[in-house]
């Protein structure tokens, strides 16, 4: 999708990869060093909750972003192979996102905390639902059984547009999640200007930069001489 931005996709894919590594490292440091670690089962319910931000960021946001960029990262690869990688990465992101949401519910249920009372939780459920619908439609239309070429051609721009919308919604909700958790921690006595607070805020900023890089990489052309219009995914 070349939109006359005057820039190529490649620099933004490189930036996104670097920012993904940084964001993943930062959320792991936060969850393990500052929040005590991760656990599937524990008497310390906070350790169960810690699985949620790790899976949502690394599994849902980062892997989902890599899935979006795969046609830019591998522009000369066999189309069917690239399409399969795109499908698998989005499927992994969807599954890990769903598991991440499960651990948020598990923490709430075992801690006696109400579910689905915040805007973050509402948008989260809505986003994962839309992500699942998008994946199913993409699978049926472009992979198996596959629609007719003219149908693929008509669906493709909407598939891309809706996919970017859902991804941006997921990014926005991740920011809400960081804000909500940090607000809870600070209301419980966490130093507003302490190391952990700064780490959380900087992690959120890195996620914003990562998401912006992904979106620009998706809409910028692989080569500046590319014609305008969406063309990285053939209809066949």
Curated annotation (Swiss-Prot):
It is an enzyme of class 1 (oxidoreductase). Binds 2 heme b groups non-covalently. Residues 1-11, 72-84, 144-153, 223-236 are cytoplasmic. It holds the Pfam family Cytochrom_B561. InterPro entries: CYB561/CYBRD1-like (IPR043205), Cyt_b561/ferric_Rdtase_TM (IPR006593). GO terms for cellular component: membrane. Two-heme-containing cytochrome. Catalyzes ascorbate-dependent trans-membrane electron transfer by utilizing a concerted H(+)/e(-) transfer mechanism. Heme b 2 binds at residues 86, 159. The lineage of its organism: Eukaryota, Viridiplantae, Streptophyta, Embryophyta, Tracheophyta. Keywords: Electron transport, Heme, Iron, Membrane, Metal-binding, Oxidoreductase, Transmembrane, Transmembrane helix, Transport. Inhibited by diethylpyrocarbonate. This is Ascorbate-specific transmembrane electron transporter 1.
């Amino acid at each position: 999708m070349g939109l006359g931005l005057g820039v190529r996709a490649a620099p933004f894919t490189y930036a996104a990869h670097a920012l993904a590594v940084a964001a993943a490292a930062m959320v792991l440091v936060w969850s393990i060093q500052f929040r005590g670690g991760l656990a599937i089962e524990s008497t310390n319910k906070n350790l169960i909750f810690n699985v949620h931000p790790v899976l949502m960021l690394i599994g849902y946001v980062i892997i989902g972003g890599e899935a979006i960029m795969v046609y830019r990262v591998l522009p000369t690869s066999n189309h069917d192979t690239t399409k399969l990688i795109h499908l698998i990465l989005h499927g992994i992101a969807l599954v890990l996102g769903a598991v991440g949401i499960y651990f948020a519910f598990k923490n709430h249920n075992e801690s006696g905390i109400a579910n689905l009372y915040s805007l973050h939780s509402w948008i989260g459920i809505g986003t994962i639902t839309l992500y699942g619908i998008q994946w199913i439609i993409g699978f049926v239309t472009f992979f198996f059984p596959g629609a007719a070429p003219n149908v693929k051609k008509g669906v493709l721009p909407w598939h891309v547009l809706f996919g970017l919308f859902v991804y941006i919604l997921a990014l926005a909700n991740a920011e809400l999640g960081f804000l909500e958790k940090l607000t809870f921690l600070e209301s419980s006595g966490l130093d507003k200007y302490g190391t952990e607070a700064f780490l959380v805020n900087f992690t959120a900023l890195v996620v914003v930069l990562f998401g912006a890089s992904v979106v620009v990489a998706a809409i910028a052309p692989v080569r500046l001489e590319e014609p305008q219009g969406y063309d990285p995914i053939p209809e066949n």
